[in-house]
């Protein structure tokens, strides 16, 4: 089973994201900021990371930059999930090492589309 780490300071966003990802067949872990997420990644690198931009302690941009410098940190597919809509900000996230970008609010179809495009969705039998 593929793993996804949800990194967001909003408990509500983490809960909604968890439901979507579990429905897609992922094992899910949660972190409320970049520091907690980095500790989790150092212990067990996930297959995917759903990452908020604006968080206390360490924001998403700093997290992805640090992640990509870690041993094995190039492996996870990082999807930024943010209310930042300016093209310059999206480009900044992708240049920092993110693989995809989703604008909030999002739904299951949007998340599934991005994960599928990144090759992370497994065929599931009914």
Model-found features: residue ranges?
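C-terminal output helix
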Residues: 106-115
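Receiver (REC) domain active-site loop signature in two-component systems and cognate sites
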Residues: 55
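Acidic catalytic/metal-coordinating carboxylates
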Residues: 33-36, 59-65
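Alpha4 helix (beta4-alpha4-beta5 surface) of REC/receiver domains from two-component response regulators
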Residues: 62, 85-100, 113
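Conserved Asp/Asn-Gly motif in the active-site loop of CheY-like receiver
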Residues: 31-35, 90, 108
